């Protein structure tokens, strides 16, 4: 999945519902950056709610030939803290001759001069992932994003692209503000269940507080 709510709705509809039937939810994290928290949160939330908490990330693509271990550590740390547990390096190539060397580098293979030292970084990733997955994440807040309402209206042509972009920005801001206040949360959909443990469909987690995002119409 890509970062923006607009792109997700146009191609996937309600991505959270789709993730719920995945054996291993996954994201595509591109660039020398840490993406909006929604990209990581939507996959890690569904994995906690329906599975074992494992989430795959195709990562480090487009980080550039000059990327450093420190930069890679920052990129992966930003994903791990939001629930990503398994890396899939982007990419490895049989050859980087000619134009191949321009195919969204860096390449995480023997062509890199630092390849022999990469195992130390990989060990750090492994240890960090072990630390995150051995414990049990404790959070009490569920955020219902506006995907369901927007998807229905988007298909009917009732929402303009500008309005969807506005709702997407508000949803991203809500997530960033909650994390800034150190309020961890999951994303979810209304089909998760009711207001008691007996009513909820999802057997793995129970939330004490639910926040409906602006644009959530279908509850």
Enumerate the language-model features and the residues they cover:
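Carbohydrate-binding surfaces of carbohydrate-active enzymes
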Residues: 1-219
């Amino acid at each position: 999945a890509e970062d923006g709510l607009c792109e997700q709705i146009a191609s996937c509809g309600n991505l959270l519902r789709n993730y719920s039937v995945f054996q291993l939810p996954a994201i595509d994290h591109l660039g020398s950056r840490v993406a909006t928290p929604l990209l990581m949160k939507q996959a890690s939330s569904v994995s906690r709610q329906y599975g074992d908490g494992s989430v795959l990330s195709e990562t480090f693509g487009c980080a550039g030939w000059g990327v450093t271990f420190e930069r890679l550590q920052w990129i992966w740390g930003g994903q791990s803290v939001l629930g990503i547990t398994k890396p899939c390096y982007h990419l490895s190539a049989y050859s980087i001759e000619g134009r191949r060397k321009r195919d969204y580098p860096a390449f995480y293979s023997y062509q890199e001069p630092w390849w022999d030292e990469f195992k130390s970084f990989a060990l750090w990733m492994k240890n960090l992932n072990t630390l995150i997955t051995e414990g049990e994440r404790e959070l009490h807040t569920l955020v219902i994003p506006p995907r369901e309402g927007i998807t229905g209206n988007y298909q009917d042509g009732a929402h303009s692209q500008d309005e969807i972009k506005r709702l997407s920005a508000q949803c991203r801001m809500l997530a960033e503000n909650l994390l800034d206040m150190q309020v961890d949360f999951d994303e979810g959909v209304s089909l998760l269940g009711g207001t008691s443990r007996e009513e909820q469909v999802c057997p793995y987690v129970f939330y004490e507080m639910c926040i409906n995002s602006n644009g959530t119409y279908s509850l």
